[in-house]
Amino acid sequence: MFRTMMNGKIHRATVTEANLNYVGSITIDSAILEAVDMLPNEKVQIVNNNNGARIETYIIPGEPGSGVICLNGAAARHVQVGDVVIIMSYGMFTTEEANKHEPKIVVLDEKNHIEMILPEEKTHTTL
């Protein structure tokens, strides 16, 4: 049996752009992608802290160090520039792998620079 587990998480990213006329996807600063082990074209879930929307799309890498978080195409309808979002990727693991799995989690500051890397998520954690 395989279990779907969170593999990477970008916490408190600030939306810098919303481009309705692009074909689709989310553009993410490639330096952030590297820190959380996310790849171009990987499926991600995006949760908007401002309006509660949850959407799925795929990643396009952005300029490293730019801080870009841009929702493209139809996904742009679910955000406004300045919204705070959580971006998560998932992987499928056997139960044995899942018990040993350690997701990569980064917390961003208001300019989308990595503020901290968390070794794990604890219950009742507030940032």
Curated annotation (Swiss-Prot):
Q: Does the keyword Cytoplasm apply?
A: yes
Which cofactor is recorded for it? pyruvate
Keywords, A to Z?
A: Autocatalytic cleavage, Cytoplasm, Decarboxylase, Lyase, Pantothenate biosynthesis, Pyruvate, Schiff base, Zymogen
Its Gene Ontology cellular component terms are:
cytosol
Give the reaction(s) catalysed: L-aspartate + H(+) = beta-alanine + CO2
Co-factor binding details: Binds 1 pyruvoyl group covalently per subunit.
Query: A Pfam family name for this chain?
Result: Asp_decarbox
State the EC number(s).
4.1.1.11
Give me any GO biological process, just one. pantothenate biosynthetic process
PTM note: Is synthesized initially as an inactive proenzyme, which is activated by self-cleavage at a specific serine bond to produce a beta-subunit with a hydroxyl group at its C-terminus and an alpha-subunit with a pyruvoyl group at its N-terminus.
Top-level taxonomic group: Bacteria
Q: Which residues carry this modification: Pyruvic acid (Ser)?
A: S25
Active site as annotated: S25, Y58
Write out the residues that bind substrate.
T57, G73, A74, A75
Q: Could you state a single Gene Ontology molecular function term?
A: aspartate 1-decarboxylase activity
Q: Where can this protein be found?
A: Cytoplasm
Give the metabolic or biological pathway. Answer: Cofactor biosynthesis; (R)-pantothenate biosynthesis; beta-alanine from L-aspartate: step 1/1
HAMAP family to which the protein is assigned, alphabetical: PanD (MF_00446)
Any idea what job this protein has? Catalyzes the pyruvoyl-dependent decarboxylation of aspartate to produce beta-alanine.
Tell me the subunit arrangement: Heterooctamer of four alpha and four beta subunits.
NCBIfam families, alphabetized? panD
PANTHER family on file = ASPARTATE 1-DECARBOXYLASE
Q: Which family does it belong to?
A: Belongs to the PanD family.
Q: What is this protein called?
A: Aspartate 1-decarboxylase
Species name for this entry? Listeria welshimeri serovar 6b (strain ATCC 35897 / DSM 20650 / CCUG 15529 / CIP 8149 / NCTC 11857 / SLCC 5334 / V8)
